From Swiss-Prot:
Organism, as annotated: Mycobacterium ulcerans (strain Agy99)
Quaternary assembly: Forms oligomers.
GO biological process terms on file: negative regulation of DNA-templated transcription initiation
Annotated GO CC locations: cytoplasm; nucleoid
TM annotation in the entry: none
Keyword hit for Cytoplasm: yes
Keywords assigned: Cytoplasm, DNA-binding, Repeat, Transcription, Transcription regulation
Protein name: Transcriptional regulator MraZ
Amino acid sequence: MFLGTYTPKLDDKGRLTLPAKFRDALAGGLMVTKSQDHSLAVYPRSEFEQLARRASKAPRSNPEARAFLRNLAAGTDEQHPDSQGRITLSADHRRYAGLTKDCVVIGAVDYLEIWDAQAWHEYQQLHEENFSAASDEALGDIF
């Protein structure tokens, strides 16, 4: 399970060090993909494969399903962390997420999200007040 908030730095070569506590779960390979709110999602390879299989079952006659599958596949990059736990984020991914040197990696239960630190701060400011109401609406009877 991926939980917590971490603040790694992006180096000049576009490498980001993953939190040490997640490296074992990601050692078998991982997939970096564009996500909502101009963040990046990092999935263990096995988790991403399940997601892609489910997405590929959508009817190809549905334009939204085709667009989602195309964007998912085209916006995904397979990575293997180096011996120091670093991954290299593509220039396209860095540009999409607006990444600067200061980044935030958050656990999102079954995957990680990578944010530019300033964008994450702004997102939290915007959504923090609505957290309780949103959890009631979005999660219903789960809690």
